[in-house]
Amino acid sequence: MLERRQFLEMAALAALAQAGPLSAADEFDAPGSDAARQALALKQGRVTSAALVETALARLERVNDRLNACRFLYADAARAQAAAKRTGPVAGLPTFTKDLAEEKGRAFTEGARAFATRTGATDDGAAAAIAASGLISLGRSTTPEFGLLPTTEPLLGGPTRNPWNPAHSSGGSSGGAGALVAAGVVPFAHASDGGGSIRIPASCNGLVGLKPSRGRMAGEEGDKGVTAVGVNGCVSRSVRDTAAWLAALESRKGPYPPVGLVTGPSRRSLRVGLRGAGHAGEPHSDVRAVFESATDLLKRLGHRPVEAPMPYDAPAAIDAFLNIWGAGAARSVQGVQAWLKRAPGSDDLEPSTFAFAERGAKLGEAQLGKAVATLEGAVSAYLAQFDSFDVLMTPVLGAPPPEIGWLAPTLDFDTLLERVLAYVAYTPIENAAGAPAIALPLGMSAKGLPIGIQFTAPPGGERRLLELAYAIERARPWHGLRPDVWAA
């Protein structure tokens, strides 16, 4: 027998199927509008891909001066793609690609002034997967330099601003994607995550952000080990849009069976581990309040929350992660030097990049090996905790989105690092573990800024997370919320 909600959803879809043509703007602004609705309208012939692209371009023009979320636009190429026949569940829908992914012939700055004029030589795995899905990328969304910081305030182009309050950060490193989706320019956008960079902008902008398992997505099948921290995904305004992106772009040759399209919640009662404190201690009081509210919601949904103590030496694990992060920054600086054919200076790279790179460059082979071993031990303990519960729940961040400048790359590095560690107090371990994690917008700060809660499962457990996310979304819907900067 159909549940009442399922019956109403089916009735709504049937009514939609019988409706006459709508303007493309309706597919962006109507209640509940998202990528899934746009895809249905395309399939039914009630709207064209060209109309969706033109509408998204117009919406970008309305808000980008206030948000600074897209610096490179490829409108003519998008129009040409929209005119071509494209097949697939997300084909023909507009999106943006983060400026850390390499797209052939398009700007490839990685947020660095040194690469201000560089263009991509080829499509990397993420860009190739986006193209193969039939999605139409309108342009490049902003990112901090090399994706190193949890805010998008590069000296190349200036800060990207939060649609809920433009004086505040949109997060990072997928801050441009987060701002564009939250402001209603497109329903979902490419994002990537090496330490929280999908989940952080999702939390800052009131969005859904799924970090997939290591090796899950097309082009990432060979990634292995705790140092392979980066994955690709999206930020979106609805769970079903995130599920659709995953189904369309996941690998069929990865280490886990394909998830496929997850369409709704499970009836299963889950054991949920609760960890409110991060490696830096207790979060901001507004974050703690949202966390407690989410705990109550889980109980009402029939789940079984249990306290989950920290199973590993968090300070040692974070220090090891920072050493590996620094080694990556050092490689980025070496790449800049090869590109410039000279040593980069202060006009090329930001102070924080040099500082991270200096930390990495100082590591000898033995020290780096010790960092890897420390992180492997932490990951082993982290994964073992899932013997005691099905899902782990934490905040996404230690505080609400800060004001622009609080995490600026020009700050004294000791001050910046102290602030970063207090802010990014929950998300890096999932990258080292290769575990999937989803951020959901479950509350607001006293100042009206979004606060996200994170749910994590063992590697390969995306279906479990999406089913739980559907149930939470139905119980506490966020679709009607609109930020101060909205593209209509």
Positions of predicted regions on the chain:
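A short helix-breaking turn/cap at a secondary-structure junction
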Residues: A24-F28, V208-T295, Y312, R476-A488
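N-terminal secretory signal peptides and thylakoid transit peptides that target proteins
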Residues: M1-A14
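Short helix-loop capping/hinge segments that flank enzyme active sites or metal/cofactor-binding pockets
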Residues: V90-R113, S266-R275, I324-L383, P395-A399, ...
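Short glycine/serine-rich loop segments
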Residues: T122-L246, N431-G443, K447-G452
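Short, surface-exposed loop/helix-turn segments at secondary-structure junctions
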Residues: P402-Y423
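Acyltransferase
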Residues: A51-E54, A83, S285-M310, V333-P344, ...
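Residue-level signal for inorganic ion chemistry
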Residues: A56, T242, V272, L298, ...
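Gly/Ser-rich catalytic/binding loops embedded in alpha/beta enzyme cores
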Residues: A11, L16, D26-G194, S293-D296, ...
